Amino acid sequence: MLAHIHDIPSCNLIEGYDAQFIHTAQATYSHVKAKAGAVLPKHSHPQEQVSYILEGKFELTVEDVPYELSPGQVFVIPSNALHSGRAITDCFILDVFTPMREDYREKGGIQLG
């Protein structure tokens, strides 16, 4: 199945974070645009999360340990790990969640596979 990122609708996750979702039978792919200074509150989820920083600088805190991520860096957040974040600059991030996030599926995006 084929799709173009420009054809995927965007939705607002929380203030300062907009995302486009691609859902498959096994995963959710989230293309996130975060505005500089936008804060992602502390949370956890049962899915493993892989975050790939495409543009910008992002401060990710996992289990109270802060990491400053830059373009090209990848970080794996284990299932159920408490984490939060802050966009230091405008950011473009690819997040991959396994298994699929039903809560994000309800927000929209497209289903492939």
What are these regions, as identified by a protein language model?
Residues 79-103:
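Ligand-binding loop in jelly-roll beta-barrel domains
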Residues 48-58, 63:
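Glycine- and acidic-residue-biased ligand/ion/polar-headgroup-sensing regions
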Residues 54-55, 70-71, 89:
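A cytosolic small-molecule/anion-sensing beta-strand core signal
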Residues 30-44:
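Conserved short histidine dyad/triad with adjacent acidic residue
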Residues 28, 57-59, 66, 82, ...:
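Structural motif
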Residues 64-79:
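Short acidic-glycine-tyrosine-enriched beta hairpin
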Residues 1-26, 109-113:
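A short, N-terminal "cap"/entry segment at the start of jelly-roll beta-barrel domains
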